[in-house]
Amino acid sequence: MSGVRAVRISIESACEKQVHEVGLDGTETYLPPLSMSQNLARLAQRIDFSQGSGSEEEEAAGTEGDAQEWPGAGSSADQDDEEGVVKFQPSLWPWDSVRNNLRSALTEMCVLYDVLSIVRDKKFMTLDPVSQDALPPKQNPQTLQLISKKKSLAGAAQILLKGAERLTKSVTENQENKLQRDFNSELLRLRQHWKLRKVGDKILGDLSYRSAGSLFPHHGTFEVIKNTDLDLDKKIPEDYCPLDVQIPSDLEGSAYIKVSIQKQAPDIGDLGTVNLFKRPLPKSKPGSPHWQTKLEAAQNVLLCKEIFAQLSREAVQIKSQVPHIVVKNQIISQPFPSLQLSISLCHSSNDKKSQKFATEKQCPEDHLYVLEHNLHLLIREFHKQTLSSIMMPHPASAPFGHKRMRLSGPQAFDKNEINSLQSSEGLLEKIIKQAKHIFLRSRAAATIDSLASRIEDPQIQAHWSNINDVYESSVKVLITSQGYEQICKSIQLQLNIGVEQIRVVHRDGRVITLSYQEQELQDFLLSQMSQHQVHAVQQLAKVMGWQVLSFSNHVGLGPIESIGNASAITVASPSGDYAISVRNGPESGSKIMVQFPRNQCKDLPKSDVLQDNKWSHLRGPFKEVQWNKMEGRNFVYKMELLMSALSPCLL
């Protein structure tokens, strides 16, 4: 065997890929080979960082492993130690050097962290500075130069600090002087709008209307104070004003006079507890100071209190059939039966309690702003009358006295006329009359609108005048038929709505007076709409050449109408062969009868008296037309079709 030549054999793995699965038929499924990144990750997972990294332990472990793995290697190792020859020891782990470097870096970081903790906390160790050698007694010229520069810089800094302190004081004084000038300028603006006077060391103003003729006893005095709630160190706010006003506590907040009309009277227990809803304060005009808005609101509160006091005084003094009721902040009057007029003083202050009460008592809007505005106009007129009645300064040699007394001499006024001039209506009486007119006008408008929406034929139109009086309004009512406005315009009514009655003026000048009852106006308009149908037939007959035989607005025959009277008209065809009779009532409606010639009436019995043929041309009895089966959009259109069917065809 020794003489046989050696053969070189290449040994390689039997399978380059690992077998994943072997099927029942012997088919093997291989795993794909790992990529370089996957192989790197697999090798990194084999590193055990928990074991020690000492070289002695590794060498000991390697020696023991080799001794256990190769029993015959002990003697050779001893021989190597004795000889002192260092042999290469392979590592047990992949990337062993990487692991060792990472562990050493971690150890250094831990040591650095501990040192920093000791330096910062100083609980366990204190670091003393390293002592330096003392400088020689002889100083360098550079050191002397540095010391001189430091002294000069310190002197310059002291000068700058003193200058900055002086500048700060001057700025503060300028701000104080500016605030003082602003206070004087604001006080000048305040004097341009309000009456001011100086009493002692205080500046007082007047909110009342005494100079305009008011007799309200409230003093209405406010005080002008200087606003000192400003920190000069902070930035001045944009809305800052150096002047402020202090008004009486009873004039704070907002107030208004609420006037409402109620159809049903509330219980007697509800009187004086009117639901208040807070009206927002008026927004200040851009550029106006805040004290202007504050004083205007306070003056408005004072005026509202004066109006309510005047109304309460008149309500107690006036003797009426239904006495007026004054309870707390509410005045209740009864202008019409089952109708109430409520006048309330609503005053809400700026405190939280009143705001909470206002939010809880918030109610729907039923306030009549027109009457509130009229109350303000009436109180100003009352002020003007009071101011004009005051005797002005006059010469002693020619006294002219009161205006009414002056007029009584030249114009020879007697006592009754002078008394009539002196007697005038009060504020409450005027506002009650205006409330009556507003309620009557709204009721008339509602009645006309309900009829216009309920009745389509004929149509009713209302044209309200935009120029009205506080005690009288006018509306023009037109009753027309759709498509026939040019020929059917005979019903034109002018309604003059007053305080307690409505005057109706017809087109021909007739005048009818209606009361405040809603039913009277409704019945009158229904009767006029009924008469319009008959007038439309009359105008249509003239256009189509038919002859009007009879016409009456008030028919005495037939069923009696509960609303007004029925009207009727009879027209004949141009040839005289046919006749149409129309009767229209407000409740019974329309009834149309047609009269045919006798020769066309087959159901007439033969008469032994009338033997001549000329009597056959006379018209026979009337036959009623089934009006609801006629085609047409309205009454006049149906009547036009009926007349066209009965008229001869002219070719």
From Swiss-Prot:
Ubiquitous. One of its GO terms (biological process) is positive regulation of transcription elongation by RNA polymerase II. One of its GO terms (molecular function) is transcription coregulator activity. It holds the Pfam family Med17. Keywords: Activator, Disease variant, Nucleus, Transcription, Transcription regulation. One of its GO terms (cellular component) is transcription regulator complex. Residues 51-83 are annotated as: Disordered. It is found in: Nucleus. InterPro entries: Mediator_Med17. The keyword Nucleus applies. It is linked to Microcephaly, postnatal progressive, with seizures and brain atrophy: A disorder characterized by postnatal progressive microcephaly and severe developmental retardation associated with cerebral and cerebellar atrophy. Infants manifest swallowing difficulties leading to failure to thrive, jitteriness, poor visual fixation, truncal arching, seizures. There is no acquisition of developmental milestones and patients suffer from marked spasticity and profound retardation. Progressive microcephaly becomes evident few months after birth. Belongs to the Mediator complex subunit 17 family. Interacts with GATA1 and PPARG. Component of the Mediator complex, which is composed of MED1, MED4, MED6, MED7, MED8, MED9, MED10, MED11, MED12, MED13, MED13L, MED14, MED15, MED16, MED17, MED18, MED19, MED20, MED21, MED22, MED23, MED24, MED25, MED26, MED27, MED29, MED30, MED31, CCNC, CDK8 and CDC2L6/CDK11. The MED12, MED13, CCNC and CDK8 subunits form a distinct module termed the CDK8 module. Mediator containing the CDK8 module is less active than Mediator lacking this module in supporting transcriptional activation. Component of the Mediator complex, a coactivator involved in the regulated transcription of nearly all RNA polymerase II-dependent genes. Mediator functions as a bridge to convey information from gene-specific regulatory proteins to the basal RNA polymerase II transcription machinery. Mediator is recruited to promoters by direct interactions with regulatory proteins and serves as a scaffold for the assembly of a functional preinitiation complex with RNA polymerase II and the general transcription factors. This is Mediator of RNA polymerase II transcription subunit 17. It comes from Homo sapiens.
